[in-house]
Design a protein with these regions (language model features):
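Generic detector of low-complexity/intrinsically disordered segments
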Residues: 11-13, 21, 37, 54, ...
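Predominantly extracellular/secreted and cell-surface proteins with exposed
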Residues: 69-169
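Secretory targeting and sorting signals
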Residues: 1-30
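Intrinsically disordered, low-complexity, charge-dense segments enriched in Lys/Arg
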Residues: 168-181, 185-186
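N-terminal segment immediately downstream of the Sec signal-peptide cleavage site
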Residues: 28-90, 181-219
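Elongated scaffolding segments in large macromolecular assemblies
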Residues: 146, 150-174, 195-203, 208-217
Length: 219
């Protein structure tokens, strides 16, 4: 092989190696995320109550817990906290209460307890999205009877439960097959392999400061 050819080959190999190293070490440039739109929740500073319409279900594995009574309360942030030029507006809410609950497993009675700091945030859009934050260990289902089980939601960290909001008279907050991380402990009949549950519920929201007004989410 001629000296000129060997030199060209060596230069080509070095260039290829340099390109290979560059492709490995050069940082990837991510596409910019779209900015969230503006959100305003009104009336500012008004208290509200969310009341379950129909039934709420929490399904873990083959077991479904159904409750027909659930209530939570909260307050729209006072101005200017009820507005966000580029993102959601968040409101603290009381831990939702759940009662009149039944299990899909015969002979098993569930009890639902909630605790901690809960919140709900609204992001204007089409549709309007709602995110309920469950604090760590903030919802626990305990069953007695033929199967003694404990289901703990958000077992290791706060969990974001996605839903939607619809303005109206009254407005509604809906969760459809929303995924919630869980751990399940117990013996025979308990779905101990389940790591997530599906939550379904529709809440009607009323303005308790002035019942003639409606809680509204807009731009």
């Amino acid at each position: 092989m001629s000296r000129t050819r060997r030199t060209a080959l060596a230069l080509g190999t070095a260039a290829a190696a340099a390109l290979s190293v560059a492709s490995v070490t050069a940082p990837a440039t991510a596409a910019p995320s779209p900015l969230a739109g503006s959100t305003t929740v009104t009336p500012a500073g008004h208290a509200f109550q969310a009341t379950l319409s129909g039934k709420a279900t929490l399904k873990a594995g083959s077991v479904t817990v159904t409750c027909t009574v659930s209530v939570s309360t909260g307050t729209v942030p006072a101005a200017p906290g009820n507005q966000n030029a580029a993102g959601p507006v968040s409101s603290p809410i009381s831990p939702p209460t759940y009662s009149s609950c039944t299990s899909s497993v015969w002979g098993v009675t569930p009890t639902v307890t909630t605790s901690g700091s809960w919140s709900v945030s609204m992001q204007n859009g089409s549709p309007i999205t709602a995110t309920m934050t469950v604090p760590t260990g903030g919802l626990v289902v305990h069953t007695t009877g033929l199967a003694t089980c404990t289901v703990t939601a958000a077992p290791s960290a706060p969990a974001s439960v996605g839903g939607s909001w619809a303005n109206g008279a009254p407005p509604s907050l809906t969760f459809t097959n929303a995924s919630v991380p869980v751990t399940v402990t117990g013996g025979f009949g308990c779905p101990t392999s389940a790591t997530s549950s599906a939550f379904n519920a529709v809440y009607k929201v009323t303005d308790t400061t002035d019942p003639a007004q409606q809680i509204t989410v807009g731009p």
